[in-house]
Structure formats: structure tokens, C-alpha cells
Swiss-Prot record:
Induction: Expression is regulated upon white-opaque switch, during cell wall regeneration, and when cells are grown on lactate. Also up-regulated upon milbemycin A3 oxim derivative (A3Ox) treatment. Repressed by BCR1. GO terms for cellular component: extracellular region; side of membrane. Residues 272-293 form a propeptide. Residues 161-187, 233-262 are annotated as: Disordered. The gene is PGA31. Keywords: Cell wall, Glycoprotein, GPI-anchor, Lipoprotein, Membrane, Secreted, Signal, Virulence. Its main location: secreted. It is a lipid-anchor; GPI-anchor. Belongs to the SRP1/TIP1 family. It is found in: Secreted, Cell wall; Membrane. This is Cell wall protein PGA31. It comes from the Eukaryota. It comes from Candida albicans (strain SC5314 / ATCC MYA-2876) (Yeast). The keyword Membrane applies. The GPI-anchor is attached to the protein in the endoplasmic reticulum and serves to target the protein to the cell surface. There, the glucosamine-inositol phospholipid moiety is cleaved off and the GPI-modified mannoprotein is covalently attached via its lipidless GPI glycan remnant to the 1,6-beta-glucan of the outer cell wall layer.
């Protein structure tokens, strides 16, 4: 039986932690003409791409190898895929070229550090093979007239999610007053209808809130204030947690005539549903009053 030594376990652990991460590169500068511009590459020769400033928020998708400390893109070569690593040339930063690529460290804030990173700049008219630098800023290694920039990596995809979750766990928890989103006010599809019924010698105004479903007939007394609980039938689309609102009918008190107390029958029909959904059918509510003199 073979046992793993401590050195072997350490090697396995470091290999497991190494990962290929998806990144994009951006330029940071005090000069607004180039600040926050994404970086992309353009073909300038056989398996050779120069880095240029593209546009704000627009950047090429690249990869970063934690183990080899290299930034690279993948180049299709027939049925195989080869790495085209970032190299710092004599005057320009490029993908491809000789060597295994420049060793790059990425800080927690995304800043790239490598040999010559302190002198990186953006410049035009660098006499590149295809003359792209006539209209676009090339990413160069120093030089007179170059605008100083700092390269910053932004993680994308799953790496972005893991980075954001780790940073949020390290940050203090915000208070409820500052982080809670305002609660949405529920919207109910109800409508209010006002009916005018003439009595002798007084008049009464009745206001009903009718639901979007079929409502049940209710007899309402013509004097006093009455709360009608059966006017609204719970809507199928309404939230089950929301309590159905009650309808209050206010009427003007009047002397009750001698004999049988008069009553008024108020009925809400299905026409309310059409009016609530923007239809042209009016809500039909009938109030029949029987009076005995």
C-alpha cells in the first residue's frame, strides 16, 4: 500500500486550487479619452495580435491561468486548440509571439502586475503592420506621447459570481433601512360605482366597490350606515394572502315612515369584469326601492 507524503498532498492541493478563469481587460487612466476603454486584439501577423483600446465597456474575452500566471486567448489550429499568450514586446503588448508568455499577477482589485506594467500606455501612429493605430489607440510599453494607463482585469461568467459572493461575505452587512427594497403595493382590479336613488322627500347617495368577478345581490337598508361584506367575491387571480376589502355603504338618515320599513335591493352583475379590464361594457347595477306611504 502506498501512502502520500506531505509534499505530495501539498502538490495535489495546489493543483486543485489552480483554475482557468475568464477575464476581460480594461484601461484605467486619469485621461477621460481612454479611461474605462475595453481592450481587444487585432491581427497584425502570423499568429500575432496587437492589443488596442476598443470602446468603453467593450472588451475581448480572454483567459487567465492561475498556475502558469499567463493571460491568453485560444487559437484554433485545425482540429486542435493552442494558446496565444500575452507577451510584452519591445514597443507593444501582443497576444502570441515567441516564448511562453509574460508572467502576470492579478491583485484583488483586478490590477495587472508584470515586468513593465508601470510603463504601459496608449498611443496612436506606432507604425504597426496594418496601420490600425492610425485611428485606434494601441497598448504600448512606454514611449514619448503615450497616455499612461493601468491594465485591470474583470472576471466574467462563474468567476464573476464567485468573486462577488466572496467580496460580499467580507463586507459588513448593510442595515435593513439602507438595503431593503421598497415593498410593492398590491394592485387590485376593483372599481367604484356611485348610484343616485331618489327618495321622498330626501335623496340618498350609495357608493359601491364592485369586484372583477360575479358579485352577489345584497339588500341594503335605506337608513343608517351599513357595511356590505358579501358584495365582493374573492378573485381567482388575486393573491390568496390579501384579505378581500369590505364595501361600506353610507346613506343619509331619514325619518322612517310608518308601517313596513323600506328596503333597497342592490345587485352587481358580471358587467363589472368587462369595465375593469378596459372593455367598453358598462357596469350595470340596479337599485329597486319599495316605499310604503
Amino acid at each position: 500500500m502506498k501512502f502520500l507524503t506531505a509534499a505530495s498532498l501539498l502538490t495535489l492541493s495546489s493543483s486543485a486550487l489552480a483554475a482557468i478563469k475568464d477575464i476581460q481587460l480594461y484601461a484605467q487612466s486619469s485621461n477621460n479619452e481612454v479611461n474605462d476603454f475595453g481592450i481587444s486584439s487585432r491581427h497584425e501577423g502570423a499568429a500575432l495580435n496587437y492589443l488596442f483600446l476598443a470602446a468603453p465597456g467593450v472588451a475581448e474575452n480572454l483567459k487567465y491561468d492561475d498556475e502558469t500566471k499567463t493571460v491568453y486567448t485560444e487559437l484554433k489550429a485545425g482540429s486542435s486548440t493552442v494558446r496565444q499568450p500575452l507577451n510584452v514586446g519591445n514597443t507593444v503588448l501582443q497576444l502570441g509571439g515567441s516564448g511562453d508568455g509574460t508572467k502576470v499577477d492579478i491583485a484583488e482589485d483586478g490590477t495587472l502586475s508584470f515586468d513593465g506594467s508601470d510603463s504601459v500606455g496608449a498611443a496612436k501612429n506606432i507604425n504597426d503592420p496594418y496601420n490600425y493605430s492610425k485611428d485606434s489607440y494601441a497598448v504600448v510599453k512606454g514611449g514619448d506621447g503615450a497616455i499612461p494607463i493601468k491594465l485591470v482585469a474583470k472576471f466574467t461568467g462563474d468567476d464573476k459570481e464567485s468573486a462577488s459572493s466572496s467580496s460580499s461575505s467580507a463586507a459588513p452587512e448593510p442595515t435593513a433601512s439602507s438595503s431593503e427594497a421598497p415593498k410593492e403595493t398590491p394592485v387590485y382590479s376593483n372599481s367604484t360605482v356611485t348610484l343616485y336613488t331618489t327618495y321622498c322627500p330626501l335623496s340618498t347617495t350609495i357608493t359601491l366597490t364592485v369586484c372583477s368577478d360575479v358579485c352577489t345581490p345584497t339588500v341594503i337598508e335605506t337608513s343608517g350606515s351599513v357595511t356590505v361584506s358579501s358584495v365582493q367575491v374573492p378573485s381567482k387571480t388575486a393573491s390568496s394572502e390579501a384579505a378581500p376589502p369590505k364595501t361600506t355603504v353610507d346613506s343619509v338618515s331619514k325619518p322612517a315612515p310608518s308601517g313596513k320599513k323600506p328596503t333597497a335591493a342592490v345587485t352587481s352583475f358580471e358587467g363589472a369584469a368587462n369595465a375593469l379590464t378596459g372593455g367598453s361594457v358598462a357596469i350595470a347595477v340596479a337599485a329597486a326601492i319599495g316605499l310604503v306611504f
